[in-house]
Structure formats: C-alpha cells, structure tokens
Design a protein with these regions (language model features):
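Active-site neighborhoods and metal-handling regions in enzymes and metal-associated proteins
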Residues: 1-599
Length: 599
C-alpha cells in the first residue's frame, strides 16, 4: 500500500534540493550533539521516511531514497518503509554497501552532497570528505532543508534544569573538573570543547529534561586550564541553578552563541574535540584558526566508572526496581485471560508500579512490550491504536527501565502467559544459560567486552542462531540508559570504541533469540565489574549483579542445560527469592517461591 504522505514530503524535498543545487541529501535522527535519542524537534529522518528507530540514516537523490539501519531494526524498518519508495539497506550484511561506498559509487563528478552540518558528527563528515574528494564532490553543510517543508515542526527544547546534590553525585564539580583537566593535559590540549550532553550533565552535576527519558539539557562547554564556560539556554535556568553555577565559577553564555564564541577565540589553541559528538559545523569552525587535538572526551571514561556513592545508591534503586518488575510479572500471570490486557496497558501497569517508588523521576526509555511475533522486533513499540491483546498463551517480552534519584535501570524479561512450543522452550532455556554464563565471567584485567561476549553468545551459536546485535552496553547514573565507552559485542565494526573493564563500570547482559514471524526472547540484567584476586598473574575481575527479577520457570527445560548452567541458574533464582520476597505480600511470596523453586 502506498504511503502518499511520505511520498509527497520526499517530492517537496527533491524540489528544494534542486533549488539549492544539491544532488544527494542526507538526514539522520540526531541532534546538534549526536545524541542517540533526540527531542521531537530533530526527528527529520522520521518525518521524511516514516522509520521511527533510534539508529538510521536516510539518503535522498533525484529518483530514489535509501535508509541504512542495523540488525536491531531490520524487521521494524521493513514494515515502516512499506509504500514510501524508500529502499532498506541492511547494514553489515553481505553485499550491502556502506553509506560511503554507496555515495562513492553513485555520485558523479562535480555533484553536491548536502546535509545539516549541525547534526552530522565531525567523524562522519570527514569520512564523506575523504571518499568524495577524488570526484571533486562539493559538500553543502550550511542548510537544514527540512526547515521550510516541516511547517508544524515541534518547538526547540528548553526544559527546566536542576542541580544534582553532591551527596547523590558522589563528587563535586571541582573534583570532576580537576580530573578532566588532568586527562586533557595528558592528551596535549590546553582546552576542551565538550558537546556530549550526558557528559556535560555529569561534569557540572546538573540534569535537564530536553530529551524524552534522558535527563539532559541542550548545552556545550568550553573548558580551559583555568576556566569553564557553559553554553545553555538561560531561560531554562532558575535562580537556584544560576546561583549554583556562579558559586562554582562556571561562566554561563547563551546556547546559540557557541559558534560566534569559537570564531572569536585567539588563534593557536590546542583544543581537544571528540569527533564522534562534535558536529561537523563546529569542527569546521575550529579548523580555520585552531590546532585540533582529536581524541575521546576525557569525561566519558570518568563518568563510566561509578564512584562508591553512585554504586551504593544504584544497589538500593535496582532492588526497588526489581521488586516493581517482579510484582508486575505476578499481576500479569494472574490476570491474563481474566481481563483485557494489551501490550500498552501491560506497559502502563508496570510504569505505575515504578511510579510508586519514592525516588522515581521518569522512565529511562519507552517500554518495549512485544507479544508473540512482535517480540521478534528488538525495539518494537506498541501504540494504543496498534497493539496486540494478550491471551493465556505464548510469551510477552518486556524491556523497560526507570530514572530514579539514585540510578537508571534497564531490565528485560520474557514472560510465559500460557502454552509454548518445545522449540520456544529450548530457545528460552539457552538464552537463560547465556545470561548465566556471562554473569559468572572471571577474567584478567585488560579484557574488553569483545573478549567476554562469546560467553553469552556460545549457547546460542551452538544452535546455529545469532541475535545480530551487541550483548551489552553501559548504563548511566540518572542519565542515558545507553552509555559508553564500555560495550559487549563479538566483532569489531568501523568507528567502534572499546574500553577495558574497570572496577566500578556497569554493563548490561542481554542475549536473545529473535525468530521473525514467531517469537522473540531476551533476558537482561545489569552487572558491575569488580576487582577480584590480585596475584603474580595480575588483577582478576568478576561481575556483581544488580538486577534481581525471576527467570520464568515455565519456560525452562533443564534437559538442555549442563550441570554448571543448572547450578548458576538455581543460585540466581534462590538469591532473587531472598532479596525480593521481604517486599511482597503473602500471595506474591508464595508464587515467587514456586517460580524460583525455593519451596
């Protein structure tokens, strides 16, 4: 079926491209800081192709259009692109060109590539420069072509900013600035242009609300050896925040003056920029008069290693969150088939359980609740107008989390609602085995997630199946649910950043199996890397679990598990009962005892 709305928007865009002398135009769902999740104001790619996933790049040319996205979104993209005339390019699949390869192969000598340089990372802009220079292709990065077409575009975000008390943050702004400057100096820089929103919030101990579920405020910072300048919308600051920033000797300037400020800097500074998050526009501005030190934001690693205050609060919050999820599972299992429950109303009930926790602030991302085959779409999002009704059969996958004054949670459970096939039971059992194997990793300091990923992936690979995405990501502290530089993947991909696991780093553990048209299974816990024995061989490490939610007993068939996997699973279930049961009523407690095989 044709999607006339999208086709008409693309026609208007092509007309605008012709007027501006642009042959190929590129759009991402990205903001001026290359954030993963963005305010609705920045959803230009979605506006022009209907794809709502968090990762994807749309390229439009005279007689065609293509969307590049990763394995998490293949199924979703197929459905959302139907009838739009936009072709799906499945990234990292055999025979599929990268965006750079496609542009190199399809753009002609002397043509023009256009994009809004404020939403393209400098890293990507530089790649396009290099690929296209041999054909003398011009890059036009000064214009947002959507501006005149998207007439009902949402307002630019400017939500209220708040201060995060040092008792909750665990470190003062002064301590964080000192650590940042030390790392900056080691990189040979005398200044830092910081553009990554969660790094900015962490550094200044502030939080915002400019991105749904991400407590960040639109901002930049310019840090020197002596000063710190914060560029932020001053209408978002109340008197308390203004006084707080002044008390910590942080100069405040208006958000949209950053380009003029950088242009006016004396020439010759050695400025550290992280090209993954610095926009192409800011990069080109600095390139004219400054020496650019291209490296990683020093704040990223500092933020990723949680301090003792953060870790203590996280343990408390994850326990409360685990209780809420466990209560939700009990409610769902005892009410399905007795009253109408949809994917959306189930998610709403879980949100309500979280809202009962005093420290609750917001969700950490929109809840993913996928029933039966919908669960095969890793980032499926049901809507009131388009959602499945749950029946006492099959399974419901629920991936959810909360923002609390004390931590950010992320947990997935796949819940049995009634009869399931032997194949599904086998798949579920092996996903549970995968989670347990990674949970019990024991390694020498120096490993990255790529070294450990096989522990989770092996039970699934043994069935000749793969889940086509990473196994884990870092989680912020009252910040973004996806955080780096630590991650867990099985292979290296272009532009990928890796980090050695440090004591205090958190990571998700979320293997899965996704069978299109049938079912999806994911189990996800959050863990913290901790130092273990240190001896003549080096520093050994292990993971400590933060998430304590039962793994569904009805979906486990122990004939597929070896003795070690059984032992790990029984230990986890036993600990779940010990930690969660004190917060349950008698009916819930009795159910949990059976669910975890304690009685």
């Amino acid at each position: 079926m044709e999607n006339k709305v999208i086709q008409d928007r693309l026609a208007l865009l092509r007309k605008k491209m012709q007027e501006e002398g642009i042959d190929f135009y590129m759009m991402l769902t990205a903001d001026f800081h290359n954030s993963e999740y963005v305010n609705d104001y920045f959803k230009v790619r979605e506006y022009f192709c209907n794809f709502t996933g968090s990762n994807g790049t749309l390229v439009v040319w005279k007689d065609g259009a293509g969307l590049w996205t990763d394995g998490r979104y293949f199924i979703q993209a197929e459905a959302e692109l139907e009838g739009t005339t936009v072709e799906l390019f499945r990234m990292l699949q055999e025979g599929v060109p990268t965006i750079e390869e496609f542009l190199e192969q399809n753009m002609q000598q002397g043509q023009t590539l256009g994009f809004d340089g404020r939403v393209i990372a400098a890293m990507d802009g530089k790649k396009y420069e290099k690929v296209l220079e041999k054909k003398q292709i011009r890059i036009a990065y000064e214009k947002d072509l959507a501006e005149s077409i998207w007439t009902d575009r949402p307002d630019f975000p400017a939500g209220k900013v708040t201060v995060l008390d040092e008792k909750i943050a665990g470190k003062s702004v002064e301590e964080k600035l000192t650590e940042t400057r030390e790392k900056m100096a080691k990189d040979g820089a005398n200044a830092l242009l910081l553009t990554k929103l969660d790094d900015l919030m962490w550094l200044f101990n502030i939080r915002g609300c400019d991105v749904e579920c991400n407590p960040v405020a639109m901002s930049y910072a310019y840090i020197t050896e002596e000063s710190a300048t914060l560029f932020i919308q001053q209408k978002a600051l109340d008197a308390q925040v203004t006084e707080y920033l002044a008390a910590h000797r942080i100069e405040v300037k208006e958000y949209d003056t950053v380009v003029d400020f950088l242009k006016a800097l004396p020439a010759g500074n050695a400025i550290l920029v992280d090209n993954r998050y610095c926009s192409y526009t800011l990069y080109k501005t600095l390139q004219k008069n400054q020496k650019l030190v291209e490296g990683k934001n020093p704040t990223e690693l500092l933020k990723a290693i949680k301090n003792p205050v953060e870790l203590a609060r996280m343990q408390e919050i994850f326990l409360k969150d685990s209780v809420a999820v466990t209560k939700f599972i009990y409610w769902l299992k005892t009410h399905v088939g007795k009253e109408k429950i949809t994917e959306v109303t189930a998610a709403d009930y879980l949100e309500q359980k979280r809202r009962e926790i005093p420290e609750f602030l917001d969700l950490s991302f929109p809840t993913i609740a996928g029933y039966k085959s919908n669960a095969a779409m890793m980032h499926y999002e049901a809507t009131p107008d388009n959602c499945a009704t749950l029946e006492p059969e099959g399974m419901l996958l629920v991936d959810s989390g909360g923002q609390y004054l004390g931590g950010t949670t992320d947990v997935t459970r796949t819940i049995v609602l009634g009869p399931i096939s032997e194949e599904i039971k086998k798949h579920y059992t092996m996903v549970a085995a995968a989670v347990m194997q990674l949970t019990h990793a024991h390694w020498l300091y120096g490993c990255t997630g790529r070294n450990l990923d096989i522990l989770a992936r092996q039970p699934i690979w043994d069935m000749d199946i793969d889940y086509q995405c990473g196994t884990g990501h870092g989680v912020g502290y009252i910040l973004n649910v996806h955080e780096g530089p630590q991650n867990m993947r099985w292979r290296f991909t272009g532009g990928m950043v890796e980090a050695v696991f440090e004591d205090g780093m958190d990571i998700t553990n979320e293997p899965g199996i996704y069978i299109q048209g049938s079912h999806g299974i994911r189990i996800e816990n959050v863990m913290v890397a901790k130092n273990d024995v240190k001896n003549e061989y080096g520093q050994f490490m292990h993971f400590e679990t933060l998430t304590w939610v039962p793994i569904d007993r009805e979906a486990i068939d122990e004939k597929y598990l070896n003795d070690t996997q059984k032992k790990y699973l029984h230990e986890y279930q036993k600990t779940v009962y010990e930690k969660i049961s004190p917060y349950l009523n008698e009916e819930e407690k009795e159910w949990l005892a059976k669910e975890t095989r304690v009685k």
